[in-house]
Design a protein with these regions (language model features):
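A generic secondary-structure signal marking the coil-to-beta-strand transition
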Residues: 20, 55, 90, 140-142
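Long, charge-rich low-complexity segments
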Residues: 28-46, 130-150
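Catalytic core and acceptor-binding pocket of nucleotide-sugar-dependent glycosyltransferases
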Residues: 50-133
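Short beta-strand-to-loop acidic/aromatic patch adjacent to the donor-nucleotide binding site
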Residues: 1-9
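Conserved catalytic core of nucleotide-sugar-dependent glycosyltransferases
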Residues: 9-84
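Ordered hydrophobic segments in well-structured contexts
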Residues: 23, 95, 142-145
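Short, flexible loop/turn elements at secondary-structure junctions
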Residues: 6, 98, 148-150
Length: 150
């Protein structure tokens, strides 16, 4: 899964020693509503002291199917629980689930990141995006995001 507003600034090795990597951001994100949903729906707490949110991740669809045997039930729960205090993050949920239940399945790799963002009421122009890409081409960052928030 790669978010559409993510730009890779250099080659990233997805696998190491035959295992997929979790990519650990140098940004600290601890958005409590994500952990509230994990606890309510999955009975799962935060397992690590870093975020799994890094705008891209390799998901094992077989594990996802075990985590979510009834997709319709999950959608109903998201709609029922969703509030400013309770939100789903697929990255936090999957990363913490794997860490708890399959701790040797993934490796990890630190990434240097940079984030640009603004509200969608002020859309990015093609020229602005090109300028950000050009400015970061020589920066010591692995990836950067150009978010539009609603």
């Amino acid at each position: 899964c790669v978010d559409s507003d993510l730009i890779f600034n250099r080659t990233i090795d997805i696998f190491k020693d035959g295992k997929p990597n979790f990519f650990v951001s140098d940004r600290d994100q601890h958005h409590e509503p994500y952990f509230n949903f994990m606890d309510l729906y999955f009975g799962l707490s935060r397992q690590v002291d870093h975020t799994f949110i890094n705008d891209f991740m390799i998901f094992d669809k077989n594990i996802c199917a075990k985590m979510i045997p009834n997709k319709d039930h999950l959608v109903l729960a998201i709609n029922a629980f969703m509030s400013d205090d309770c939100l789903l993050s697929e990255f936090e949920t999957y990363g913490n689930y794997i860490t708890k239940n399959h701790p040797d399945l993934y490796g990890s790799q630190l990434t240097k990141t940079k984030m640009y963002g603004r509200y969608s009421s002020e859309p990015w122009s093609g020229e602005e995006i090109k300028q950000i890409v050009d400015e970061n081409r020589t920066e010591d960052v692995d990836l950067f995001t150009i978010h539009s928030w609603t």
